[in-house]
């Protein structure tokens, strides 16, 4: 039997106090809508329909061609939102999952189990439920003495007995697709909120003696719907714990897992050691045996095997095996470091390729450069790559030696095995095997220091 999915993503999210649509707020690097959509993929839907409304083009852009879209101009309740999908799904045979786009913690495994339960029990409708210690604000699941679901009652419509019930509606359902849209034609706004409740279709099915079931989540956290920043922070905490636990199970050591931030798409190989206060974001890959020390920040980068990154920032860069970086280094976008390169403290590299075993140990800026292998870049070296309008390239050959406090004015080429003298300003090509000296000759004036006002001899 075919599966379909309807994702409800039309709401503004007033309690978020934000210009951003609620479902576009991020949890561990992905929007809530993306988390939900990835989980929905577990049921292999033939067609997914996303109901959009507030700032619809922003929401549409997140899923693009992965989903069909329908527009809910007025937000008149969950039942009304699902009605909008009628043009896409009416009359089709199959099972339809309905899920809110603000439930980022729901897992694909739970949705697959929900569908299987629905099919195996031959239900017309199956509600995903959970047991809440504090059910206030949730719709309650009302069962008869035989344990059968007879209705769902919203908090504002619940009587005193119903408000004591602990089993809550998570807002996720599976329906027989045809019967869903037939029942939606019968619901009304005769309730405390004056809205079309999707939950009213359960009462309709029961009145027709059709089978309604409930599948109870094992982990209550999966039921969390995010309506404000407090819930968003809770979702972030739970997701972060899931992510670090997944990596630990896969062989990663965290010295202080509560303090690290790792986003959903980060990949980490076994035998990596991660100290506290490390941030890994975007599409980052960390190779086996690598050590990331306290305070390291890496985004959208590939770090090879057996690297050591000490308290440094790395953005959109590629590091081969055995590279060492830091402390206090900054690798900016477009940086590529070959095997066993060393980038030391207070070194910045941007848009450059550095060959294997090259070392830049201290206080250096390398920008828009092609640096060969086994080059020594002395402390205080600056590649002067920008003239106020354009940027130019510096090329340094293999085994070159760049003396401390060298200023290399691009465009410039320093040949293989060439040397620049310490303190030089180099603006012309340095041929292979040459030495370039670009500084004034030292002039020493013996005894002249005594003429200075601060000299001790002047105070007598």
Curated annotation (Swiss-Prot):
Active-site residues from the entry: 362
Family, as annotated: In the N-terminal section; belongs to the N-acetylglucosamine-1-phosphate uridyltransferase family.
Gene3D superfamilies with a match to the protein in the record: Hexapeptide repeat proteins, Spore Coat Polysaccharide Biosynthesis Protein SpsA, Chain A
Start and end residues of each stretch annotated as Pyrophosphorylase: 1-229
This protein's name: Bifunctional protein GlmU
Binding site for acetyl-CoA: 379, 385-386, 404, 422, 439
Function noted in UniProt: Catalyzes the last two sequential reactions in the de novo biosynthetic pathway for UDP-N-acetylglucosamine (UDP-GlcNAc). The C-terminal domain catalyzes the transfer of acetyl group from acetyl coenzyme A to glucosamine-1-phosphate (GlcN-1-P) to produce N-acetylglucosamine-1-phosphate (GlcNAc-1-P), which is converted into UDP-GlcNAc by the transfer of uridine 5-monophosphate (from uridine 5-triphosphate), a reaction catalyzed by the N-terminal domain.
Gene Ontology MF terms in the entry: glucosamine-1-phosphate N-acetyltransferase activity; magnesium ion binding; UDP-N-acetylglucosamine diphosphorylase activity
Region (Linker), start-end ranges: 230-250
Pfam families hit by this protein: Hexapep, NTP_transferase
Cofactor note: Binds 1 Mg(2+) ion per subunit.
Primary localisation category: cytoplasm
Substrates-to-products reaction catalysed: alpha-D-glucosamine 1-phosphate + acetyl-CoA = N-acetyl-alpha-D-glucosamine 1-phosphate + CoA + H(+); N-acetyl-alpha-D-glucosamine 1-phosphate + UTP + H(+) = UDP-N-acetyl-alpha-D-glucosamine + diphosphate
Pathway listed: Nucleotide-sugar biosynthesis; UDP-N-acetyl-alpha-D-glucosamine biosynthesis; N-acetyl-alpha-D-glucosamine 1-phosphate from alpha-D-glucosamine 6-phosphate (route II): step 2/2; Nucleotide-sugar biosynthesis; UDP-N-acetyl-alpha-D-glucosamine biosynthesis; UDP-N-acetyl-alpha-D-glucosamine from N-acetyl-alpha-D-glucosamine 1-phosphate: step 1/1; Bacterial outer membrane biogenesis; LPS lipid A biosynthesis
UniProt xrefs under InterPro entries: Bifunctional_GlmU, GlmU-like, GlmU_C_LbH, Hexapep, NTP_transferase_dom, Nucleotide-diphossugar_trans, Trimer_LpxA-like_sf
Organism, as annotated: Streptococcus pyogenes serotype M28 (strain MGAS6180)
PANTHER family recorded: BIFUNCTIONAL PROTEIN GLMU (PTHR43584:SF3), NUCLEOTIDYL TRANSFERASE (PTHR43584)
Taxonomic path: Bacteria, Bacillati, Bacillota, Bacilli, Lactobacillales
Region (N-acetyltransferase): 251-460
Subunit and interaction comment: Homotrimer.
Keyword Oxidoreductase attached: no
Cofactor(s) for this UniProt protein: Mg(2+)
First-level EC class: transferase
Amino-acid positions noted as binding UDP-N-acetyl-alpha-D-glucosamine in the UniProt annotation, renumbered to this chain: 8-11, 22, 72, 77-78, 139, 154, 169, 227, 332, 350, 365, 376
Gene that encodes the chain: glmU
